[in-house]
Regions:
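C-terminal "cap" of GNAT-fold acetyltransferases
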Residues: 166-198
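Conserved acetyl-CoA-binding loop of GNAT-fold acetyltransferases
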Residues: 154-164
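A short helix-loop-beta-strand connector motif used in the catalytic cores of GNAT acetyltransferases and
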Residues: 45-61, 72-81
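Conserved acetyl-CoA-binding loop-helix of GNAT-fold acetyltransferases
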Residues: 113-131
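Short glycine-/small-residue motifs
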Residues: 65-68
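Conserved beta-strand-loop-alpha-helix junction that forms the acyl-donor binding cleft
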Residues: 113, 140-151, 164-171
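Conserved acyl-donor/pantetheine-binding loop and adjacent beta-alpha core of acyl/acetyltransferases
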Residues: 70-107
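Conserved GNAT acetyl-CoA-binding A-motif
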Residues: 106, 132-145
Length: 198
């Protein structure tokens, strides 16, 4: 009886591992209904798209937007929306002289899920995008001072940077892990290997 139970548990784990995980596509959104934003509905669409700021969404397999995240790009960590506005304007002006490269820090100032689990998948997709970026080195939030925001970011792997008067900042570590560094070295070495057939 114990053996049968153990076999069932092993099979259950195998089935779970083989289950198809949902696929998402990160896309830049040209339009959103800002009134749907539960975090910062007061920020206009124009604000979210000016001075190099961007709006991203993740599209699920059904073609629906599962979550939305808005970004500003800066060189420092802002403590308020007003500071973020000024910093992203400054980074946008500097980008004119740097072939369009704007800011080294992606500031996620609002995120919301339109479908269950969308927020977590949004963080994962943005994490991948920033990790693959040539000029972004950090992913930091400008979150409201709520327990819900704190729990969400800590649960998804962020570290608290600072608590401000009206906001709090969390940072997602986007440095390559040791495994990823080793994988990169092995891949590069393999590409540079001359193969000969004898």
């Amino acid at each position: 009886k114990t053996r049968s139970y153990t076999n069932k548990m092993v099979l259950k784990k195998i089935y779970k591992a083989l289950e198809k995980s949902p696929k998402f596509e990160l896309i830049e959104l040209p339009f959103i209904d800002v009134t749907e934003d539960p975090v910062r509905p007061e920020l206009s669409l124009e604000f979210r798209q000016s001075h190099g700021r961007k709006i991203y969404g993740i599209r699920d397999e059904e073609g629906d937007i599962a979550a939305v995240m808005c970004f500003a790009f800066t060189h420092d960590i802002p403590k308020s929306v007003e500071e973020m506005d000024a910093m992203s304007r400054d980074a946008a002006m500097q980008a004119i002289h740097r072939a369009g490269v704007q800011g080294t820090i992606a500031i996620a100032y609002t995120v919301w899920a339109k479908k269950k689990g969308g927020g977590k998948h949004m963080v994962n997709e943005v994490y991948k995008m920033i990790k693959e970026s040539n000029h972004l080195s950090r992913l930091v939030t400008l979150s409201p001072l709520t327990d819900m925001a704190r729990k969400f970011h800590l649960k998804n792997g962020a570290k608290e940077v600072q608590v401000n008067l009206t906001t709090q900042n969390f940072e997602y570590n986007i440095e390559l892990s040791e495994w990823e560094k080793l994988k990169g070295k092995v891949t590069e070495k393999w590409r540079n290997t001359t193969w000969s057939i004898k």
